[in-house]
């Protein structure tokens, strides 16, 4: 039994798979936030500038592209954080697009990190690696995105709506809680702006989140 466990640990180590909070809770989430910031968030900023200053190139050309590429940007960032082989990184672009389409940024995150790890497991294990590795990564990732995505997206939207409604009903206490939580997130290696974007916070809740920054 011990030999089997040792063999399993050695195999996972060889594949660069580390089951730890540091890897999935810090590294992956931090990279996801970077991917989200480099696509959707920066696109939102440029869209606002383009709208206010009447620059159609920013609001009508760059903004739609940046929004559509949010999932792929998140996926590539996560795959690189997990030190995935090139074939897995390239394949994750499709996974990220599907995950974001059906489940938003969180859907892209879950679909990508699971499929990337599976892709790493099969990478270079067969003589037709160029077929097997992308196929495993894409099929598992897109399946996860389409299967789990809608439920994840519904939960995130509902959670965001609950926070905004609660902040409207109890602006002082809920505003304080939201601002404190966002302030705490600022001390972590993830983006507080990305968190607020995932929850679609607006109105009083959005203002409280801004105060927390």
Can you name each region flagged by the protein language model?
Residues 2-213:
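Pore-lining transmembrane helices
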């Amino acid at each position: 039994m011990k030999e089997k466990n040792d063999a399993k640990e050695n195999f996972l180590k060889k594949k660069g798979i580390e089951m730890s909070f540091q890897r999935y809770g810090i590294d992956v989430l931090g990279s996801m936030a970077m991917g989200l910031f480099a696509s959707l968030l920066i696109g939102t900023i440029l869209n606002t500038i383009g709208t206010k200053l009447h620059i159609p190139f920013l609001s009508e050309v760059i903004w739609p592209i940046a929004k559509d590429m949010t999932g792929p940007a998140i996926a590539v960032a996560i795959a690189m954080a997990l030190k995935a082989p090139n074939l897995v990184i390239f394949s994750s672009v499709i996974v990220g697009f599907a995950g974001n389409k059906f489940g938003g940024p969180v859907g892209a995150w879950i679909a990508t990190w699971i499929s990337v790890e599976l892709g790493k497991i099969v990478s270079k294990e067969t003589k037709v690696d160029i077929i097997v590795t992308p196929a495993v990564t894409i099929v598992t990732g897109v399946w996860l995105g389409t299967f789990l995505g809608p439920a994840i997206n519904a939960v995130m939207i509902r959670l965001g709506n609950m926070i905004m409604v609660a902040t409207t009903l109890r602006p002082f206490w809920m505003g304080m809680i939201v601002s404190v939580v966002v302030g705490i997130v600022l001390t972590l290696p993830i983006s507080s702006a990305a968190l607020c974007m995932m929850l679609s916070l607006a109105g009083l809740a959005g203002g409280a989140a801004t105060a927390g920054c």
